[in-house]
Amino acid sequence: LGDVYKRQSMGSVLLMCKLFGMDEAMTVSLIPKSVTTPIAVSVAEGHGGMVPITVVAVIFTGILGSIFAPTLIRLFRVNDPMIAGISIGACSHAVGTSKAIELGETEGAMSGLAIGVCGILTVLFSMILMH
């Protein structure tokens, strides 16, 4: 699930940036938006991105995920706490994980696990997508 999400998330950011005519530096800055700030900054710096843009994108993604995750989980009738936690952690990193912990112990644990897995996948996929 995390692997599929990461490829789709990074691919959709890449596609949207191309569609809207954004330059390479902006694209590289936005691609790692769904991981923790230290990983996102490292990925952006390593590929010539603008760190301030990356930091804002990461924070914005985390806050939106934290706000909308409970509603989306109910809307899509996600009843499995493991799936809910993985989804929250994969999409909205540590800020979302704080919301997942409020939802339940399993959600929080799986969200934390998803942060690590998605961080690793982001580093690997960014090397593929950005070259």
Language model segments and positions:
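Short, exposed beta-strand "edge-strand" segments with a Pro/Gly-rich flavor and a Y/T-containing core
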Residues: 16-22, 30
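Short, small-residue-biased leader/transition segments that mark boundaries at the very start
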Residues: 1-5
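Transmembrane alpha-helical segments of multi-pass membrane transport proteins and ion-pumping complexes
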Residues: 6-18, 37-41, 62-74, 94, ...
